[in-house]
Each structure stands twice: as structure tokens, then as C-alpha cells.
């Protein structure tokens, strides 16, 4: 009886050791950059960050040129501002697919993930701000017998 109790205690100790949250480690390549992929709607962004002067390049162009609307530039800066790291990292990203709004959201998502790869201690702040969550909303498909996804054709009674 005591053997089974002892083995149960060992088993429960093993289970609690396994269920601990995984420790997030720093993931940096040989060039000192952290990499992550971000997605939003149809857009996919590949983002690399490294310590620097705060320069942001999107598809080999300055962020002010690529994203002309101030709202989109502000969206991209949000993770850096929330983590109090604005102007401390150089960001290089390539983004494809979707429109400008989706692309800005994809860059923001990728930048947040890259920041957590570079500094794992920022994960809590970024998670609380909702920057690490993939926005799963995508365009609803068009249905047959309808003008659009939900819009019906005009109905005439007579």
C-alpha cells in the first residue's frame, strides 16, 4: 500500500513539473536580429528587428513613404510605444497581400512577436495590450443567390 502511495506522489510531482509554463527564450540569428511573421486579413508580414536608431523600412521604403496615412504609421508604432522601446530598434519588414490597412496590422503583429523574441520579458506587456493576438477576422465569402456575402438582390413584389 505504501508503495502505491509513494508512486502516486512521484507521479503527481512529475505532472506538476510538466505543467509549468514554458520559459520564453531570446531568439536571435547570427546577425543579431530577431525575426517573426505577422498576419492580418490577407496580408503577411515578415519582420526583422535589431538594436538601432529607430529606422523602419517596409518593402525597402521608409515607413512614411509606404504608409502615407498617419493612422497606419501610428498602428505600426503601437507595440514599440507600449513596450517603451520607441526609437531603440531598427525594423526591416517585407509585407505582401491585402490592402494597406491589413498590411499595417500584419506589420504590427509581426513586430510584436519579434519584440518578444528579442526581449522575452516584454511578452506580458504586449499580451496585455493585445498585440500578440492574431486578429482572425477575414472577409466573409460571397454566397450564390446573393449579391454579396449577405446582401440580397433587390426584391420586387410585382
UniProtKB/Swiss-Prot annotation:
One GO term of the biological process aspect: translation
Single GO term (MF): structural constituent of ribosome
Record's GO cellular component terms: cytosolic small ribosomal subunit
HAMAP family, sorted: Ribosomal_uS9_B
Protein keywords: Ribonucleoprotein, Ribosomal protein
Protein's name in the database: Small ribosomal subunit protein uS9
Family as reported in the entry's similarity comment: Belongs to the universal ribosomal protein uS9 family.
Amino acid at each position: 500500500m505504501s508503495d502505491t502511495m509513494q508512486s502516486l506522489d512521484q507521479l503527481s510531482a512529475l505532472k506538476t513539473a510538466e505543467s509549468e509554463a514554458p520559459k520564453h527564450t531570446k531568439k536571435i540569428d547570427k546577425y543579431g536580429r530577431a525575426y517573426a511573421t505577422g498576419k492580418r486579413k490577407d496580408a503577411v508580414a515578415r519582420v526583422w528587428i535589431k538594436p538601432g536608431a529607430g529606422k523602419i523600412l517596409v518593402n525597402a521604403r521608409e515607413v512614411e513613404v509606404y504608409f502615407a496615412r498617419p493612422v497606419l504609421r501610428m498602428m505600426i508604432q503601437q507595440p514599440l510605444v507600449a513596450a517603451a522601446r520607441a526609437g531603440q530598434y531598427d525594423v526591416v519588414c517585407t509585407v505582401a497581400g491585402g490592402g494597406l490597412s491589413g498590411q499595417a496590422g500584419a506589420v504590427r503583429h509581426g513586430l510584436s512577436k519579434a519584440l518578444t523574441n528579442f526581449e522575452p520579458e516584454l511578452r506580458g506587456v504586449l499580451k496585455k495590450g493585445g498585440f500578440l493576438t492574431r486578429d482572425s477576422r477575414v472577409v466573409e465569402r460571397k454566397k450564390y443567390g446573393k449579391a454579396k456575402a449577405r446582401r440580397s438582390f433587390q426584391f420586387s413584389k410585382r
